From Swiss-Prot:
Originating organism: Nitrosospira multiformis (strain ATCC 25196 / NCIMB 11849 / C 71)
Protein name: 1,4-alpha-glucan branching enzyme GlgB
Gene responsible for this protein: glgB
GO biological process: glycogen biosynthetic process
Subunit details: Monomer.
Entries under PANTHER family matching the protein: 1,4-ALPHA-GLUCAN-BRANCHING ENZYME (PTHR43651:SF3)
Keyword terms: Carbohydrate metabolism, Glycogen biosynthesis, Glycogen metabolism, Glycosyltransferase, Transferase
Function summary: Catalyzes the formation of the alpha-1,6-glucosidic linkages in glycogen by scission of a 1,4-alpha-linked oligosaccharide from growing alpha-1,4-glucan chains and the subsequent attachment of the oligosaccharide to the alpha-1,6 position.
GO terms under cellular component: cytosol
């Protein structure tokens, strides 16, 4: 086949499409570039501003294209169509080196692929897998491999893909608009794996040119770079089918849940200060977690973020594992290894706000797209970040898809949702006049409430056994109650009230604790209003708050004893458990994300003792059914004595479903209590299965010689009693020797 010179080639110099293309304002490049029928003939146009010459591959070989405009527009005209797809041979002249000649397939010979159905669901806020439509994807079209790019930018006049493969030139690869949906798309053949790219966006109203990274990218360059990376094929082979099947049917309400909260960048580091990779964490963190008896790891946000000091809470890449620690496959390797060892993995996820960095979501297409225009709704005053516009359907699709992506692609076992209180209230951390009420005149963020309910419905329906945990610091009712009864639908909520009361109480000198006894007992008034997690999280050991050990009063002996007592209280009180890394061995310094934990302190006997106590408590918590099986049921707890304020002693029973129980006695003063009588529900022998004052933990080794028998004397409204020695600043756990206490099946 050949081009016919007798064909009259009309001039394009006055063509408005040409002028729009050259001005960077052409919203439908397919109307001008690629193959067309014009004036009864076939024409192929290509725009390559750096080309000296272009040839097109026809049935007769490569034929020269005519330069139709000096800016780099080339044409080929024929009487019959070219077979698709076709290749272009491009020669780029250089004054410093031989001409560079290369062959490419024409991007504008491949029609758009995004479906109208997906666009409809996306615009309705109901597309839970928008990450499959938007972003960059390896695809093959007509036997040609390449990358399909798509992005949402409804207020753009033109969007181009720019990257290392096209000299970052926004003229070369303008995308096609899908009209009112606001989505732009382009398939580019032959994009090299892991190429850097961004979107160049021209705002419709101002003409401003913006350079934005891809919100849906799955991998970014290592900070301080901000470009997205073109995708590469995953080589991950999962080996956690057994774990996933068991998770789908597990009764998590009655199962041990003991979370080790980890900041991946500062748990441990190499001698030169560099991070451990995801794979290295699998080699080092995972064995440690197993040794210590935790059931889950909760990772502080590992979605991509530009600033190390934000700990991940200022997310810019909601679909990408941060490249600080490796690739997505590396993270999958870590999670897979955890599952094979029986450890779950929870991700700290941040849908409450996003940073103002100009390269990312903020004013993405020159308008307030993901955020509110009005700063009274769109600006978080505490953190200087933007608040998502939950009332915008496409934003809802974005966030729901982000959650779906992490749970689906990475087999994560749950999401801890950060800063829920800031989402629920329009006046959160605002003075009168600094916020706008909802349509009913109230302070509740109705759109955020709807979003959270939809999030939880999606997670629980599509990912059986996956958990959602809310960091919610107010008394909002029903956070962990089902949506069908008016709740938000979370699996669990952090018990911030218990945590605050407990730490305030523990800071008191034991001499004065008798005057604050209610801080230990008040929590039972609301303990079953939600499914609670008892957290001693990273938030309690930063910003001048000191370490947990540093909060404990007294000399060194008392500080360590107090901390062992605190952990005994936490691990025996109703609710699932969470501790931040370093708590378990009594790190002395406040956490600093720029260095690893103070592991050298384990050479000190007291620190090693706290670690051993934490390990043994973790193992007892999992082994003794009464300590975990009825965390959310009032029938699982009973006070023995909550009134002994003068001695600062409390005692209570924890019950399993089979009737077995554990007796917990806690002494919050440094004064030993000899012949201290405790009422018990059953006569017989009681085994002391834990004593935080044991010499193995660094204590004084005062106790009850392993077991004790009832006296036959009723006490504290119980049918019998035991008389015990209560060590100073210590907690004791007893079980009845005739009842099957260690029975996780109930």
């Amino acid at each position: 086949m050949r081009a016919y010179p007798t064909i009259q080639r009309p001039s394009i110099k006055r063509d408005p499409r040409l002028h729009a293309l050259l001005a960077g304002r052409l919203h439908d490049p397919f109307s001008f570039l690629g193959p067309h029928v014009e004036h009864g003939h076939w024409v192929v146009r290509a725009f390559h501003p750096h080309a000296a010459s272009i040839w097109i591959n026809t049935d007769d070989g490569f034929e020269s294209m005519t330069r139709a405009h000096p800016a780099g527009v080339f044409e080929w005209w024929g009487l019959i169509p070219l077979p698709l797809p076709y290749q272009l041979r491009i020669e780029e002249a250089s004054f410093e080196a031989p001409a560079h000649v290369y062959d490419i397939y024409d991007a504008y010979a491949f029609p758009p692929q995004v479906s109208e159905h997906d666009l409809y669901l996306f615009n309705e806020g109901r597309l839970h897998q928008a990450y499959r439509m938007l972003g960059s994807h390896l695809v093959e079209m007509e036997g040609v491999a390449g990358v399909r790019f798509s992005v949402w930018a409804p207020n753009a006049e033109r969007v181009s893909v720019v990257g290392s493969f096209n000299r970052w030139d926004g003229r070369i690869h303008p995308m096609v608009s899908h009209g009112a949906s606001g989505v732009w798309e382009l398939f580019i053949p032959g994009v090299p794996t892991d190429s850097f790219y961004k979107y160049e966006i021209r705002n419709r109203d101002t003409g401003a040119i913006l350079l934005k990274t891809d919100p849906y990218a799955r991998h970014y360059e290592v900070r301080p770079g901000t470009a997205a990376r073109a995708p590469s094929a995953s080589r991950m082979t999962w080996g956690d089918a057994r774990w996933m099947a068991q998770r789908a049917v597990w009764d998590w309400l009655a199962t041990p849940l003991n979370i080790y909260e980890v900041h991946a960048g500062s748990w441990k580091r190499h001698a030169n200060g560099s991070f451990y990779s995801y794979r290295e964490l699998a080699d080092h963190l995972l064995p440690y977690v197993r040794e210590m008896g935790y059931t889950h790891i909760e990772l502080l946000p590992i979605s991509e973020h530009p600033l190390d000091e934000s700990w991940g809470y200022q997310t810019t890449g909601y679909f990408a594992a941060t490249s600080r620690y490796g690739t997505s496959d590396d993270l999958k390797f870590f999670i897979n290894a955890c599952h094979q060892e029986g450890i779950g993995v929870i991700l700290d996820w941040v849908p409450a706000h996003f940073p103002q960095d100009a390269f990312a979501l903020a004013r993405f297409d020159g308008s307030a797209l993901y955020e509110h225009e009005d700063p009274r709704m769109g600006l978080h005053q505490d953190w200087g970040t933007h608040i998502f516009n939950y009332g915008r359907n496409e934003v809802k699709s974005f966030l729901l898809s982000s959650a779906h992506y992490w749970l689906s692609e990475f087999h994560l076992d749950g999401l801890r949702v950060d800063a829920v209180a800031s989402m629920l209230y329009l006046d959160y951390s605002r003075l009168p006049g600094e916020w706008l009420p909802n349509r009913y005149g109230g302070r509740e963020n109705l759109e955020a409430i709807d979003f959270l309910r939809e999030l939880n419905i999606m997670v629980h329906q599509e990912f059986p056994g996956a958990l959602t945990l809310a960091e919610e610091s107010t008394a909002w009712p029903g956070v962990s109650r089902p949506t069908y009864v008016g709740g938000l639908g979370f699996s669990m909520k952090w018990n911030m009230g218990w945590m605050n009361d407990t730490l305030v109480y523990m800071r008191n000198d034991p001499v004065y604790r008798r005057f604050h006894h209610e801080q230990l007992t008040f929590g039972q008034l609301y303990a079953y209003s939600e499914n609670f997690v008892l957290p001693f999280s990273h938030d309690e050991v930063v910003h001048g708050k000191g370490s947990l050990l540093g909060k404990m009063p007294g000399d060194a002996w008392q500080q360590f004893a107090n901390l062992r007592l605190l952990f005994t209280y936490q691990m025996t009180y109703p609710g699932k458990k969470l501790n931040f890394m370093g708590n378990e061995f009594a790190q002395g310094r406040e956490w600093n994300s720029s260095r690893e934990l103070d592991w050298y302190q384990l050479g000190d006997g007291w620190h090693e003792g706290v670690k051993m106590a934490a390990r043994d408590l973790n193992q007892l918590y999992s082994a003794v059914a009464a300590l975990h099986q009825r965390d959310f049921e009032p029938e699982g707890f009973s006070w023995v004595d909550c009134h002994d304020a003068d001695n600062s002693v409390i005692s209570y029973l924890r019950f399993a479903r089979n009737g077995s129980f554990a007796l917990v006695v806690l002494n919050f003063t440094p004064v030993p209590r000899y012949r201290y009588r405790i009422g018990v529900p059953t006569s017989g022998s009681y085994q002391e299965i834990f004593n935080s004052d044991s010499r193995y933990y660094g204590g004084s080794d005062l106790g009850n010689m392993g077991s004790i028998r009832t006296t036959g004397q009723p006490s504290m409204e119980r049918m019998d009693s035991i008389v015990i020695t209560l060590p100073p600043l210590a907690g004791l756990i007893f079980v009845h020797t005739d009842l099957p206490a260690i029975n996780t099946d109930g």
